[in-house]
Amino acid sequence: MEISGTSNRILEVNLTQRDVKEIQVHEKDRKMYLGAKGLGLKLLYDRLAPGIDPLGEDNYLAFMMGVFMGTGAPCSGRFAAVTKSPLTGIMLSSSCGGPFGMALKTAGFDGLLVTGRSENPVSLMIDDQGVNFEDASGIWGMDAEKAQETLQNDKTCGILIIGPAGENRVPIANIRSGDRFLGRGGMGAVMGSKNLKAIVAKGGAFTIVPKNPERFDKVKKKATAYMNRNSPTVEYRKFGTSSNVDWCNSGGIIPVNNFRGGSHEAAQKVSGKAMQKRYQTRHHTCKPCTILCGHKGTLADGSVHSVPEYETVGLLGPNLGIYDPDQIVEWNDLCGRMGMDTISTGAVLGWVMEAGEKGLLNTSLSFGSPEGVTEAISHMANGTGFGQEMARGTRWLSEKYGGREFAVQVKGLEMAAYDPRGSWGQGLSYAVANRGACHLSAYPTGLEVLFGLLNPYTTRAKPRFVYFFENLYAAINSLQTCQFTSYAYVLEPPIVKYTPKFMLGLTMQYLPAVAIMLMDVSIFSKLFSAVTGIRMNQWEMLKAGSRVHTLERLMNTREGIRRKDDTLPERFLKEGRSCDDAHHTVPLYEMLDDYYKLRGYDHQGIPSAGTLRKLGIEIKDPGVSFKGNEDFRFMVPRGKCVKRLYISVMLWFVGRAMQAAAKVDKGVKKEFEAIPKGFRFSLGVSPGGPAMVMEKTAAGRVKYVGSKPKGKPMDLQIKIKHLEGAILLFTFQESTAIAVARDRLVVEGDVPRACTVVRILDMVEVLLLPKIIAGLAVKRYPTWSPLRKHLGRCMVYVRAILGF
């Protein structure tokens, strides 16, 4: 039988009630969210209440096919999964190239939603007739590879399976399909929490035919030609994604010893070329695929194994000080059988090794030694011994034992194998990515390091390209196809391909919006239109990608995600790499505001009501109030001279307000009583920037002296390290306490008095600002009486303006 375009049928299974029903996808939702990831998020947005337990029976697990699946579109053998992560506590989306997607699609279904919890271990058997529930107690406890072999009795079958890590609800457990994985964020733990060992789909009952076959074939031919001549995709075909080792090592961004270094002379031993020669590799990849990046190889003992992907090589190799490819292959294979994410596993092992060096833990694990690693991985998967704690991730470990500054994670998800200190755009992308430190949300490091088109050590143009690639990749993961196709589709069209590299680079760096206009991503939208019959151009497709990305962010804000979470580990903000004489760090906060503006977020990183309306996203109690504040965001000064002038005026006014508050507010008076007479302190921008000088006179009065000390020595100087930090502070996007915690301030002189001054500044901000702003600017908003607040505010303003 044939399906023209797509079936638009989705199964919804409740394991608690053993109930199955069918959902129809409407054309409006198809056009707005495309499919796969986008539709999965929309379905969960309509069903998930904020704050649910990711491992509770109310969580949903969505497996979603895109419209390209089954059509023969290049690299279209991928599907998406969406749930709430037990590792991060926020939304989790993932992509996989295993055989399950094709099997479910050709069984006649575009997706599967699973909720509830089975009383006993169960497997789902799906064919064109529907769903059967089968007892899985016989395979419960088997590793993922063996259990999959037990169930695989037909070439038309596609299987999703968990290993011991998933059964034990380990927060970094993955789900396997063939030799591919839904790898990150603990999706396998969610499946295990439902006592669901496997899902088996028997396909082949249907074939998928595009609505416009002639147009489809024409676009497909063009897409294939682009990929066959694109240098990165050709490299991946020859050597796999571990060919990245060479350019990441030369670019100084490969993780070495828990991201302390960015390159190592021995890294070439684990490169794609070295492993191709060592293992005589052959293609073993997703179907259908034009790129053919997956490989298998034969070890010296004759055994055949999957050759590890770059991320696995980076995190289980140089990140641990290991340069033995056989060892990395062994650990990759073990993680695959146990059902555990190799990226998080490598990052956790790296953190434990460094924590041991620093005396935070007593461990035998150490950099450069494979001893104990195999046992540690097994303990993590089985939830035994210290492995039970390791499996909870680096964020949890560092909160318990210390060492947060070298816990290489964002929002709880461990970082992929690209050091952002050598790729500042990638640093911004990691910080703002919806699922955590993910390289698949946007990939500016390709332009910065692989192609050399953008200067990696500048903030210029980076927010624009992160925004563009986030929209593009959200669309790609909703259509769905492989993200590697974007290399070819973006850079192979003639207008880009034949522009001299230096001119293309200058355009990207200084006119990024123009450069993006030149990048032809219409192949994706043309394939979508040919398959579905729904007319769509590339700009509508990118808007759909923006809608998908923004919806995911909105769902995260319901779980409490805010600006404070869009950050990087201190290692990347304060420490240089051992391979970098210039000791570059990531100037993240210089890029964040521009990024928020492009996305239509407010100062706290919440999508504004206007943005949601523009994208057609319905507000379903997102956890914040938009009433009377629909598009509220601070006006941030732009341009260095304007910023200096703004800070000068603000310091002048705050100084006079502090002088006034010391006369009218009892709390401020009390704090100043602890400061001795004749004490002078200043708050200013370093080096040589605007400042305010305050003094408690011999008569006990608090006096604003001006912007310069006028000869008398200072007892205390509080210096803001740079102008951008001052802008964050004085546009009230960051409290003084947070600025101190983030090391934006330098204190010289009477350090104990600095705490008193910070408390006084907080009180003055409460007196000066309305609650909605002051609540962001101070560490803790006080419960003052209305009389004290409102009368005090009036008196402070009058005295500050008049200067008495």
Short names for language-model regions:
Residues 96, 143, 215, 219, ...:
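Short amphipathic alpha-helical segments
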Residues 25-63, 271-295, 681-700, 794-802:
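N-terminal-biased segments
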Residues 92-96, 182, 190, 323, ...:
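Short alpha-helix boundary/capping segments
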Residues 47-50, 107, 158, 167-168, ...:
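A short, charged
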Residues 99-100, 147, 186, 327-334, ...:
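Short, hydrophobic/aromatic alpha-helical segments in well-folded domains
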Residues 626-804:
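Feature captures hydrophobic
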Residues 77, 152-185, 191-627:
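Extended C-terminal regions of large enzymes
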Residues 1-233, 246-263:
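Protein-protein interaction/assembly regions in multi-subunit complexes
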